[in-house]
């Protein structure tokens, strides 16, 4: 008999989903094996060198609050930080960092290699070991057998991956890496619903060949935001600027003249591409009225001259890529170091997943990342953390965990996927969350770190830092409520300048801070008001808590109303045809989706409020009143 070894959890893939899955599993106490086809590519940024953005930054903060790695790696590798939507309300503000690819990957690798209970092995996986109706391990390309009752697949674009550059195409998982053909075929045998998606990347440019005098500089923010709740600015490497270029009508004419050579328009690519990150061909066709598109010039790192021209992702032939790049002002002498390409790959309908991200087709098998139809490092990492955690919990016979929609963007992401599915690469936006005022970046730790601590994900150092911050916020809020300003005892003119109006009666500082025009730092400058807190993150929490208290309370009341029936479990084998009053359309949709809870049923397109009421009555009559799954504080998962 050949080689065989056993682990509690096996994670296949070392990208953003895989590393978070393996780390979460190991932190939760499971003896975890991370299998990757190449250890040198662990944590690699396969597409653009950036972390965060609108909606995505919220996911990164939540991963961090649960003890994950992405935010810390972004702080250690980030060379350009910005807060997006900084002039808008706190619900939609988002952190984004350009990362040095080498430094980011090194930060990930360092943590992975130094995490207890986590083991690495370099080998591609070709098959699953299946015993009855559950997974029992994996078989590698050389026949090595690794056994485990829980396997997490985080295989990115590698399943049946095919790379396209113009009329030329070849098998590949990404540039320079082979695809997973045997594993893709095996999964197609097991999973009932499979499709093809597509993504792409732009040509890379030697920055020395660009005329920056024709571009617009985009410096980072000062002061810089910090991604991790336990991060600091002194961790950041030296900072650099990004730049903005623009395509021209000549650029668009070149593209239109070569569309017949594009695999997207010739029919060579069957996969659907990301709606919110279209190729330059798509932009020119879909937005024919626009005579110019922005191109963001993003540095790849401090020790390389390569730049990433974000905005001209393309699968056009290389000669066309060369011509269109040189038609952009400032790029007349540009030297392309790597061609752009499109890649299409298999994904599996996420409606065939449980909220834990365990598949319905095979017990113990979990999916995370692009295999579930998502796009983006952040979406992948969030799924990886949940899948890895639940894989570890499953082998200890603990209840699975998934945050609700009102608890986290991670909950919104997973609920959207398993309830609605997706026919195109799914990207997170703040607009997808109905409770976004409660789900801000700044309070992700307050929302999730206690839960992470209960489940063993949060270490002592992070927990101590969290408790210190939480106590400081509570202490300062109480101080502001107890401190009163008397108009007779302060500089009236200075006070009215700070509060933006007349100051004629005694008020406490918390009430004054609730006024939209009042700034915390300015308020603390008034005689008798300070000194305030020095930590800007504590000050931000205090100010947002004061200003939005009424709105947040209303949203919490709405959540409470929804929660009365949101988590009501629907029996696994519920016969929708037997429920009197449901239309044929609703019965078909419920049978196709098989929702886990009444809340999920209500979010299926075409399921009416009346149908939800009928479902509720039916389940109540059958004696159903339990939640979808126990919370992690049910006493069985203490750290």
From Swiss-Prot:
<dbReference type="InterPro" id="IPR049312">
    <property type="entry name" value="GIDA_C_N"/>
</dbReference>
<comment type="function">
    <text>NAD-binding protein involved in the addition of a carboxymethylaminomethyl (cmnm) group at the wobble position (U34) of certain tRNAs, forming tRNA-cmnm(5)s(2)U34.</text>
</comment>
<comment type="similarity">
    <text>Belongs to the MnmG family.</text>
</comment>
<dbReference type="InterPro" id="IPR040131">
    <property type="entry name" value="MnmG_N"/>
</dbReference>
<dbReference type="InterPro" id="IPR020595">
    <property type="entry name" value="MnmG-rel_CS"/>
</dbReference>
<dbReference type="InterPro" id="IPR044920">
    <property type="entry name" value="MnmG_C_subdom_sf"/>
</dbReference>
<feature type="binding site">
    <location>
        <begin position="13"/>
        <end position="18"/>
    </location>
    <ligand>
        <name>FAD</name>
    </ligand>
</feature>
<dbReference type="GO" id="GO:0002098">
    <property type="term" value="P:tRNA wobble uridine modification"/>
</dbReference>
<dbReference type="InterPro" id="IPR047001">
    <property type="entry name" value="MnmG_C_subdom"/>
</dbReference>
<feature type="binding site">
    <location>
        <position position="180"/>
    </location>
    <ligand>
        <name>FAD</name>
    </ligand>
</feature>
<dbReference type="InterPro" id="IPR002218">
    <property type="entry name" value="MnmG-rel"/>
</dbReference>
<dbReference type="InterPro" id="IPR004416">
    <property type="entry name" value="MnmG"/>
</dbReference>
<protein>
    <recommendedName>
        <fullName>tRNA uridine 5-carboxymethylaminomethyl modification enzyme MnmG</fullName>
    </recommendedName>
</protein>
<dbReference type="GO" id="GO:0005829">
    <property type="term" value="C:cytosol"/>
</dbReference>
<keyword id="KW-0520">NAD</keyword>
<keyword id="KW-0285">Flavoprotein</keyword>
<dbReference type="InterPro" id="IPR036188">
    <property type="entry name" value="FAD/NAD-bd_sf"/>
</dbReference>
<dbReference type="InterPro" id="IPR026904">
    <property type="entry name" value="MnmG_C"/>
</dbReference>
<dbReference type="Pfam" id="PF13932">
    <property type="entry name" value="SAM_GIDA_C"/>
</dbReference>
<feature type="binding site">
    <location>
        <position position="370"/>
    </location>
    <ligand>
        <name>FAD</name>
    </ligand>
</feature>
<keyword id="KW-0819">tRNA processing</keyword>
<feature type="binding site">
    <location>
        <begin position="273"/>
        <end position="287"/>
    </location>
    <ligand>
        <name>NAD(+)</name>
    </ligand>
</feature>
<dbReference type="GO" id="GO:0050660">
    <property type="term" value="F:flavin adenine dinucleotide binding"/>
</dbReference>
<feature type="binding site">
    <location>
        <position position="125"/>
    </location>
    <ligand>
        <name>FAD</name>
    </ligand>
</feature>
<feature type="region of interest" description="Disordered">
    <location>
        <begin position="620"/>
        <end position="639"/>
    </location>
</feature>
<keyword id="KW-0274">FAD</keyword>
<keyword id="KW-0963">Cytoplasm</keyword>
<dbReference type="Pfam" id="PF21680">
    <property type="entry name" value="GIDA_C_1st"/>
</dbReference>
<comment type="subunit">
    <text>Homodimer. Heterotetramer of two MnmE and two MnmG subunits.</text>
</comment>
<dbReference type="Pfam" id="PF01134">
    <property type="entry name" value="GIDA"/>
</dbReference>
<dbReference type="GO" id="GO:0030488">
    <property type="term" value="P:tRNA methylation"/>
</dbReference>
């Amino acid at each position: 008999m050949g080689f065989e070894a056993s682990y509690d959890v096996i994670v296949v893939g070392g990208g953003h989903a895989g590393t978070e899955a393996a780390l979460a599993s190991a932190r939760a106490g499971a003896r975890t094996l991370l299998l990757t086809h190449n250890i040198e590519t662990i944590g690699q940024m396969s597409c653009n060198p950036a972390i965060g953005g609108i909606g995505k930054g919220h996911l990164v903060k939540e991963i961090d609050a649960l003890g994950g790695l992405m935010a810390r790696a972004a702080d250690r590798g980030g060379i350009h930080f910005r807060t997006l939507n900084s002039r808008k309300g706190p619900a939609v503000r988002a952190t984004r960092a350009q990362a040095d690819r080498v430094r980011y990957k090194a930060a990930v690798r360092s943590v992975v290699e130094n995490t207890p209970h986590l083991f690495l092995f370099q080998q591609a996986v070709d098959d699953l070991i299946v015993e009855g109706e559950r997974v029992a391990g994996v078989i590698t390309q050389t026949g090595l057998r690794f056994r485990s009752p829980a396997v997490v697949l985080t295989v990115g674009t590698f399943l049946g991956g095919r790379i396209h550059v113009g009329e030329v195409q070849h098998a590949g998982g990404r540039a320079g890496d082979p695809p997973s053909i045997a594993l893709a075929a095996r999964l197609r045998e097991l999973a009932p619903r499979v499709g093809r998606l597509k993504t792409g990347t732009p040509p890379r440019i030697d920055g020395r060949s660009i005329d920056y005098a024709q571009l617009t500089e985009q410096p980072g923010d000062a002061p810089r935001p910090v991604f991790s709740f336990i991060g600091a600015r002194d961790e950041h490497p030296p900072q650099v600027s990004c730049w903005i270029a623009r395509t021209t009508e000549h650029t668009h004419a070149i593209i239109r003249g070569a569309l017949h050579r594009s695999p997207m328009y010739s029919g060579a690519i069957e996969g659907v591409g990301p709606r919110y990150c279209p190729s330059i061909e798509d932009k020119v066709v879909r937005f024919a009225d626009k005579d110019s598109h922005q191109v963001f010039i993003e540095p790849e790192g401090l020790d390389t001259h390569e730049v990433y021209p974000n905005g001209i992702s393309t699968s056009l032939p290389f000669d066309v890529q060369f011509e269109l790049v040189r038609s952009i002002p400032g790029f007349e002498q540009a030297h392309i170091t790597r061609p752009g390409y499109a890649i299409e790959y298999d994904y599996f309908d996420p409606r065939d997943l449980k909220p834990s991200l365990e598949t319905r087709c095979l017990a113990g098998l979990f999916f995370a990342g692009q295999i579930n139809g998502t796009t983006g490092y952040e979406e992948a990492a969030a799924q990886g953390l949940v899948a890895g955690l639940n894989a570890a919990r499953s082998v200890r016979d603990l209840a699975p965990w998934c945050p609700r929609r009102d608890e986290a963007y991670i909950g919104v992401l997973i609920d959207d996927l398993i309830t609605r599915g997706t026919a195109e690469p799914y990207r997170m936006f703040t607009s997808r969350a109905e409770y976004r005022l409660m789900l801000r970046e700044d309070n992700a730790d307050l929302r999730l770190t206690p839960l992470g601590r209960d489940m063993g994900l949060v270490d002592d150092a992070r927990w101590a830092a969290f408790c210190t911050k939480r106590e400081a916020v509570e202490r300062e809020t109480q101080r502001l409520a107890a401190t009163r300003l008397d108009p007779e005892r302060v500089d009236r003119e200075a006070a009215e300048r700070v509060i933006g109006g007349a100051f004629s009666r005694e008020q406490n500082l918390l009430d004054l801070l609730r006024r939209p025009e009042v700034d915390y730092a300015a308020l603390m400058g008034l005689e008798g008001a300070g000194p305030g807190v020095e930590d800007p993150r504590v000050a931000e929490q205090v100010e947002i808590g004061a200003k939005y208290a009424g709105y947040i309370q209303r949203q919490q009341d709405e959540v409470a109303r929804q929660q009365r029936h949101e988590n009501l479990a629907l029996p696994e084998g519920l016969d929708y045809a037997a429920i009197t009053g449901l239309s044929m359309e609703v019965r078909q949709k419920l049978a196709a989706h098989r929702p886990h809870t009444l809340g999920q049923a209500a979010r299926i397109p075409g399921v009416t409020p009346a149908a939800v009421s009928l479902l509720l009555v039916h389940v109540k009559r059958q004696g159903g009143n339990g939640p979808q799954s126990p919370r992690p504080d049910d006493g069985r998962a203490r750290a």
